[in-house]
Amino acid sequence: MVYKFETNNLLLRFFELSDAGMVQQLAGNEEVARTTLAIPHPYPDGAAEQWIESVRQSSEKGDSYAFAMIKKDDGMLIGNMSMGVSKNHKRAELAYWVGKPFWGQGYATEAAQRVIQFGFEDLGMNRIIAAAMTKNPGSYKVMRKIGMKEEGTFPQHVLKWGTYEDLVFYGMVKSDYLKRLI
């Protein structure tokens, strides 16, 4: 099934192959790639097309959902808001990146709010988590703003560009999400 959502300022839709150039440009920025778990730098030619095809297949199977964040006012792709799903455990993990020119404008928070709504209300998830490198406060501020609670820090949990990085984890259960709606 194909999902598409609108927020005040954004259209969230599945990625299309025509997005590849913008994905490579935005995600390939060294400052964006530096604090993400899987984005390479430099971003190789052809990698965006491969990634888009991979996430489209996963989205169609319901294993994960990767939404292109598109500004409604000008149609510009500005980032990615994804949610990996564990159907057996009714659990999901939120992950995202935003192109540097669009940092600090509330787009990630707006998209994350809509995607966790989708996770809890449409997919029936019981728990949604997210993680960020401790050196990326902008990312975990988004988690706080959408109501997630800090659950702990895993020291030296990932190896990024030859350096072990700490990850801070945030989470929310459905009952807490529902309380926020009252």
Predicted feature descriptions by range:
Residues 53-68:
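A short helix-loop-beta-strand connector motif used in the catalytic cores of GNAT acetyltransferases and
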Residues 40-44, 65, 135:
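Short, conserved alpha-helical segments within structured domains
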Residues 33-54:
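Conserved GNAT-fold acetyl-CoA-binding loop/helix
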Residues 1-31, 66, 70-182:
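Acyl-donor (CoA/ACP) binding surface of acyl/acetyltransferases
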